[in-house]
């Protein structure tokens, strides 16, 4: 059994595995692995711990800290900052690992823990498996999770200037010859981890900034706001006659943009702009199975290859490393610009689009002219218990028949969510009405067979 999903460990706070007891054990065994792999026995291993704005983050933070300290690991606490800030500061502090307490775009009652390696990238499968194996023995009661020698305990430190360090890092990704003084930008902070740093970065680069959903109270994170609810941003951009809108998700690693006409530009649109309109045209782009066929066609027309990876920024990163490319992402707004940051970073991705606007003197709507997404319909089917739809012959036959029906005009993708008990039914088709009808028919079939 693996406790890790596609993006760390996630669930409902108070229910296994997101409980203080489990998190304490997780901190301890992860600390043990770091101690065992420590190349310098004269120096204790250290980790950086950051979080988003969920109320439960306080409890999880304390449990993790206790676990790591018990294992003999020093802890640098940085408080609420975006996930990519933890990745950056892990490298900056020469820490052995980074830990993020967040459930990303999920509601406040969920939470999770994900890890970064010392280089600021996602933890390797080998390291994750080593943690998982030790964790299993502790959870099952076959191993202890206390430190016998009090002299070997770790310490914890609060890093007071973490926010400023990350702001400077973000600003450093923006070309020095441009500024944002001619732009009015609305930023929707999702009442999440980017509520403070997002607006500050834009202001310090000269933009006139209107911040919305930037008053977190512990339970309003992602609540009808942020990258999963761009409608409030669309309205605000039009009301304020802004040049552009930026929506972050709860942990600040996803971005959705809105142009001056109130039209949403998703991750595919952002990749198109960065690949084709930047001063240095991309050699290739890594997307995912969810990347719209319209992106593939637009990139091909520009002489740029698109490689599809499995869903998840971890797999996009692996694809980029395999090809030696620097640009990749997902329609949901995970955008990786590896020449600027080692992980998906909403603020940095947004700055790269704003840099293209400054460089070309074009509006966001002008930059997406000629870029057309195929109509896409995504229906989520919630299950009591996760199962694989491809284990049901009746469903496999239905999927194959539907794919044959739209061959040459679109595509079908059916997959399990990596973070929730959901089956995602996605249809892309050149006709919007047919697309919607087919997606709901297939979702109803999944419900009927698997419920």
Curated annotation (Swiss-Prot):
Activated by phosphorylation. One of its GO terms (biological process) is peptidoglycan biosynthetic process. The active site is at residue 104. Mg(2+) binds at residues 104, 249, 251, 253. Keywords: Isomerase, Magnesium, Metal-binding, Phosphoprotein. It catalyses: alpha-D-glucosamine 1-phosphate = D-glucosamine 6-phosphate. CDD domains: GlmM. The keyword Transmembrane helix does not apply. This is Phosphoglucosamine mutase. The gene is glmM.
